């Protein structure tokens, strides 16, 4: 997404970096021309990610939002603000931390999930999602908190599911792929299990 929008960063940060694998992959891809910083408030996550530190990759057991006078070219929040109780306040504070922001937002609301309700409850219990979005409400949330959306596209997590998980799951996986190839928005709105990657300023 950065390359397609001709953005050449020198400092990239991830808030809520977890095990740090996203930053680790990016650090390997970009090399020493870019410095990467990961922030997380979980001691358990920090113990995992600190082992991946290298010359251009550093991790901090801190809340980025509490850090004064620090900013980056790009700040990433990958599957983060759906976990935050005051996500409007979180987004407003985060805006000051970087020139560009990249968000990855699970789109938990679809016709299928609303009709069944179980997937939403499972996401709440298993993943800690306490806010649920469609594409429209996700983009509106960013605009309401002062962001300007530069670019976005869907990502399809269901494609990573292994084939041996059962015929029902494989059938739904095929249905989502076929519907998505015909009409992106309709497939996302009806069948779900998509996320949104957003570039904003």
Regions found by a protein language model. Give the residues of each.
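Conserved alpha-helix/loop element of class I SAM-dependent methyltransferases that forms part
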Residues: 1-8
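A conserved beta-strand element that flanks and buttresses the S-adenosyl-L-methionine
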Residues: 76
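Short conserved loop adjoining the S-adenosyl-L-methionine
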Residues: 66-70
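Hydrophobic adenine-recognition pocket in adenosine-nucleotide-binding enzymes
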Residues: 80
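Class I SAM-dependent methyltransferase "Motif I" SAM/SAH-binding loop
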Residues: 16-18
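S-adenosyl-L-methionine-dependent methyltransferase catalytic module, highlighting the catalytic core
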Residues: 21, 44-48, 52, 85-199
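Class I SAM-dependent methyltransferase SAM/SAH-binding core
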Residues: 21, 25-57, 61-63
